[in-house]
């Protein structure tokens, strides 16, 4: 009985972590990731990244 309760608790915790990670990924959509091109007219670089000039790629930013 104790083992079943522990499995249920760990299963719910894993489900919560998975849904949290998915939600974070969905909020970051629409931005350019590390070393992606960042030409004008494209979405901006993701948070923490900056577009470099003249190479126009997203790198760790200011």
Curated annotation (Swiss-Prot):
Protein name stated in the entry: U8-theraphotoxin-Cg1a 2
Signal peptide, first to last residue: 1-21
Disulfide pattern: 31-46, 38-51, 45-58
Protein family: Belongs to the neurotoxin 10 (Hwtx-1) family. 30 (Jztx-14) subfamily.
Pfam families: Toxin_12
Taxonomic classification: Eukaryota, Metazoa, Ecdysozoa, Arthropoda, Chelicerata
GO cellular component assignments: extracellular region
Localisation per UniProt entry: Secreted
Entry keyword set: Disulfide bond, Ion channel impairing toxin, Knottin, Secreted, Signal, Toxin
Tissues where the protein occurs: Expressed by the venom gland.
């Amino acid at each position: 009985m104790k083992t079943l309760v522990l499995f249920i608790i760990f299963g719910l915790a894993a489900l919560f972590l998975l849904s949290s990670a998915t939600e974070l990924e969905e909020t970051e959509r629409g931005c350019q990731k590390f070393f992606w091109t960042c030409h004008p007219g494209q979405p901006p670089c993701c948070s923490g990244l900056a577009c470099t000039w003249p190479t126009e790629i997203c790198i760790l930013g200011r």
